[in-house]
Structure formats: structure tokens, C-alpha cells
């Protein structure tokens, strides 16, 4: 792992001999989570057994798991095993906990898969099941204080608490909704139920405590800021109609950089103050 100083272009080697997979840094930069993969059983002979509809796709029998690499001593520790792949969702701000998910097929009922979400104590490896075989579940990320999770899911998730489609029996599953769950009480709040655009979370900012979303807003992709304190959304006044990338300082949300296009330019980078 090499660090590059953009101002001076000086390079510094931080780590050597780490596992040759992609990885995620812990918030304190004292360990990495990486993703070892195991290949599935190979079929021999002229006939091939189709285990499930997804088994028709090449390489779907392979499984990916999670492992922890300790930077101080170079020791790797396997964290997950099993018949289903496991996916890292987030690491708590203090680096003590990890959220991961699994998914399995469910060919008899929409959306034809079931997802589970787990919280792991990285010191004791104790596992707390947050959701088991939940339909329509998406991703999860920690709040800055580690006491809540920001969830994304279909309006149909969690018993349909995010549905806002009148008398229509089926909500639009492509209309991604955002929810906040309190880890102490397990109460879930559908924060985008009355917000029209489809959302994709960018960051729950430490500086102002607000959540920033990229949205599909009609013909545009706009950036909105949500205040959990006031339960309100605010559209950022940007120079672009379609914002393809947006990033802001973790502790100073007054400074951001973004890339996008409008009716008179394309692929332009801006600073937002």
C-alpha cells in the first residue's frame, strides 16, 4: 500500500505483503477487512446439475467471505464462513463492530431473494442478528456516533413502512428509500417516505450531522442534504443538472467537490463552498 501526497507527488510505502485482494480500511487504520474467495464444486462429465436458476450463470458457485488483517502484527483472521457469500456493509466509527450481510435465493416470492444483516463484535466475534431473511433489504452504514444505521431498501421492506403509493398494491421497487434504525431500540424510521426522488446515500457527515444523498430527481441527478434533527431535506444549489460524483470533507461539510453536466457543458469539475 502506497500513499501519494497530491501536492508534492511524494510516495510513501505504508504496508508490504498484505493479502492480494481488495480491502476496506478500518476508521482507525489499525486493520483491514478483505474478501477471500472460495471456488465452488466443479461438475465433471457430460451432464451438469443445475442447482438453482442462478447456477446457469458462470462462476456463481464461488463464495466470497470476510477476513481481518491486523496491521501491527500482520496476522489474518477469517471472520465469516458458510454456504452463502458475505458482504461488508460498514465498520463502526470506533472500529469495534462490523455490519455485514448475506443473501440467498427465494424463487417463489418477490424480489426472489432474502437478505440478512448481522452486527459483529470484532473483539469477541459475538454476532447480533439485526434482520433475518428480510425481503427487499438493501445496504447499511453507520451514523457518526455509531448508535444508528442508515438503511436503504424498497418501500416494501420492513412491513411496507416506506410505502406511499395510495391504493396501489405494489410499490415501485426501483424507488429506493432510506430508513434510520436505532440500534438500542431497533425502531425504524422511514425518512424518505414523503420525499419524491429516489435516493442513493453519499455520506452521513460528522461535521454537521446531516446525511447527503445523490438522487434521481425527474430528469436530473441532484444532491440533497437531510437533517435528522429537523427531519427536513434541502436541495444543494449546484451548477449541474446531472451530478455524477459528489464528495465533501468528513469534518468540514462547507467544502465539497463534484463532477457533472448541464445543458451547456459536460464532465466539468467544481468546488462547492
Model region roles, listed by residue range:
Residues 1-2, 16-21, 35-65, 80-86, ...:
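A flexible loop/linker signature enriched in serine peptidases of the S9 family
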Residues 5-9, 70-74, 121-125, 182-186, ...:
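Short loop/turn segments that connect beta-strands within beta-propeller blades
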Residues 29-32, 98, 146-149, 210-211, ...:
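Hydrophobic beta-strand positions that form the internal "hydrophobic ladder"
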Residues 208, 245-273:
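Serine-hydrolase catalytic core recognition
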Residues 27-28, 93-94, 144-145, 206-207, ...:
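Residue-level detector of Asp-centered blade-edge/turn motifs that repeat once per structural unit
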Residues 24, 90, 141, 203-205, ...:
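Conserved beta-strand position repeated across blades of beta-propeller domains
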